Amino acid sequence: MEKNNSKSIRQNSKKGQPSGQPEPLSGSHKVKNRNHSRQKHHAHHDM
């Protein structure tokens, strides 16, 4: 139950906070950045 409580609090904080919406955006950005880095690496290999 304690574990669930912790999870609920974490989700609640995320949902309750206005930063919750931009959070997923940031995550997407991070993934995009990672992808970019990967592409860059690939380009280097091609070179």
From Swiss-Prot:
Compositionally biased residues, Basic residues: 29-47
InterPro entries recorded: SASP_SspP
GO annotation terms (biological process): asexual sporulation; sporulation resulting in formation of a cellular spore
Region (Disordered) residue spans: 1-47
Domain of life the protein comes from: Bacteria
Biased composition (Polar residues): 1-20
Inducers of expression: Expressed only in the forespore compartment of sporulating cells.
Entry keywords, A to Z: Sporulation
Predominant subcellular localization, coarse grouping: other
Subcellular location as annotated: Spore core
Record-linked Pfam families: SspP
Membership in a protein family: Belongs to the SspP family.
HAMAP family in the cross-refs: SspP
Protein name, UniProt field: Small, acid-soluble spore protein P
Organism listed in the record: Bacillus cytotoxicus (strain DSM 22905 / CIP 110041 / 391-98 / NVH 391-98)
